[in-house]
Amino acid sequence: MKPLFIFGLGEIGKIVLRNLSKKEGVKLIGVIDIDPQKVGKSVYEITGIEKFKDVYVEKDAERVLKKRKDGVVIHLTSSYVKDVIDQYFLILDMGHNIITTTEEMTDPYLKHPRLAKKIDEKAKKKKRAIVPTGVNPGFAMDLLPIVFSSVFEEIKEIRVERINNASKRRFPLQRKIGSGLTPSEFKEKWEKREIGHVGLAESGSIIARTLKLKIKNFEETCDPKIAKSYIKTDFFEVNPGYVCGILHKVKIETEEDININLFLEMSLDAENPRDTIYIEGKPSLKLEIPGGLPGDESTASIAVNWIDKIFEMPPGLWTIDRLYLNHYFKKI
């Protein structure tokens, strides 16, 4: 039985536990969270999953992680590298592998090359693997088009569009897309990075790095989507003229004349939600997932399904460009 820990019991953490309850060969040893309303309670009390009735939520991460060695931690706490690096180091010092959903870790070398190098070196020193993952970033707008590229003889452009209906999503997500703000409030908060999606820039850069493309020009914009009619969700009421979502774009030009264009709409009552990959080249093809991949459920599943492989992986930080994937290349 492989020892398993959960670090962060938010909504995705609960879905991870539900997913884990159906798996064999792993044993949940501990759950870590700082929420006083959860600390001291059994996982069963919080999730209703009877299989984990003997596991309790604890605040002291070091105490929990010391219970067993040579395990894996599914890490679900923050979007930003600077917020999680100390948590990673503690986990590695305690002798565990890491599966993390921290969005910036999709390509930590983009904004935090020094910290990324430290994480990689620490993992190698401790002889453990750390795998960043998720559905977006981590799959829908980066890993999936990278793998899709392997069937192309030539590529001129990679274009990915994800349109996500946020009306039924959790409160933090509806808040982070600016629901109910005025356009000027949205602009101010986006400039401070207090709202918006984290990881689209990383998706673009990791596509370029994996395909060995040199970035010539990189542009990222995020505009508000304005409600045309009254919208009501479980958490927000948005009147016409106010913000109901984000229109987020990344445009990359490369020295190899292969353009990468990513577009993400996350909005309340978004019409025709879908994930679409267009690759122009030889041949030119379109891959579409009607309805789109469900964000929270898919993130939980992809994290859990990494457990099977992480114990076989060499030590170090395994970003997408280091995985042994077949993909398009123009030069080696």
Task: Name what the model sees in each region.
Residues 1-93:
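N-terminal glycine-/serine-/threonine-rich beta1-alpha1-beta2 phosphate-ribose binding loop
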Residues 7, 11, 15, 68, ...:
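Conserved active-site and cofactor/substrate-binding residues in soluble primary-metabolism enzymes
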Residues 7, 149-275, 293, 300, ...:
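Active-site-lining helix/loop region of Rossmann-like oxidoreductase modules
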Residues 10-12, 80-81, 105-109, 135-141, ...:
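Gly/Ser/Thr-rich loops at beta-strand to alpha-helix junctions
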Residues 97-99:
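A short hydrophobic/small-residue beta-strand
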Residues 102-128:
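Rossmann-fold NAD(P)-binding glycine/threonine-rich loop
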Residues 139-150:
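Alpha-helical support elements that line or immediately flank enzyme active sites
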Residues 268-332:
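C-terminal helical cap and adjacent loop that interface with cofactors, partners, or active-site loops
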